Amino acid sequence: MRTVKALLVIPLMTAVTTMTATAQPPPAPASLRLYVFDCGRLEGGDVSRFRLAPQEMATTDMSVACYLVVHPNGTLIWDAGAVPDSDIERANANGTSRRYRLVLPNGAERFVTATRTLKSQLAAAGYTPDGITYLALSHYHYDHTANANLFAASTWLVRPVEREAMFESKPPDLLQPSTYSALRRSTVIAITGADYDVFRDGTVVLKSSPGHTPGHQVLFVKLAKTGPVVVCGDLYHYPEERTLNRIPTFDADEKQTAASRAALDVFLKQTGAQLWIQHDFSANAKLKKAPGYYE
């Protein structure tokens, strides 16, 4: 694997030659769009891991959301869900609400209720996985990577420390390597700075926010009508983490998490951006879903 200085680029030699013919995507919009996909409902389980108690919370369940950013100069998928599309297809359950049991490599079990494949939701918006320009994951945990392999032909925007951990011989807990194994051969832009301006116009920015994982990042989207939005990955899981100032026990570095949250608070005040907590079940339920979009 060849690396290049600065923003490291790891070429995927077969991306163009092996890509299958697909339907043409919709014409590029005149202004930025943000699509929200329903990628399931994750049962929270033991919330003491988040230093919370059930009686302090509106719900212990979490939404699992994925997002598509459509820019006049390209597209970006943000996070890839918890249940692989292949599991839904194998159960012949696309369009049917079904509870899935996920078993992680360390033997831990998680339960997610999902209804539709990510591919079918993309298709409803007019897109296919192999037509997406960029893939960016907030971080490497299983409930954000389930369909990452679908986007192996996209350019992967990732921080080196995160990528290295994903392909270690013994990856950290809460990873599901089979869901992202194809990314090993993907074209990579390795982000070495705090911010990465995806389309070079300030409207779509990946911001470093380490702590939950070493290379965790959040997504800033500057929408013309909706206004600026920060989609925060797992910097917070529950809104009560924010209001009660609780940090999960399993974060890689709690001091980094606290610093990242403080830095984001400053950024939110400076920009007036809304904070979208991806796992906030109640808030996510109120968001319009694809094929509707925010602009």
Model-predicted segments: where are they?
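Metallo-beta-lactamase
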Residues: 19-131, 159-208, 226-233, 256-274, ...
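Active-site gating loops and adjacent loop-to-helix segments of metal-dependent hydrolytic enzymes
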Residues: 91-108, 237-245, 251, 292-294
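Positively charged n-region of N-terminal signal peptides that target proteins for export
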Residues: 1-6
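Short, electropositive alpha-helical surface patch
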Residues: 137, 285-295
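Bacterial N-terminal signal peptides
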Residues: 7-18
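Active-site metal-binding motif and surrounding structural segment of the metallo-beta-lactamase
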Residues: 91-158
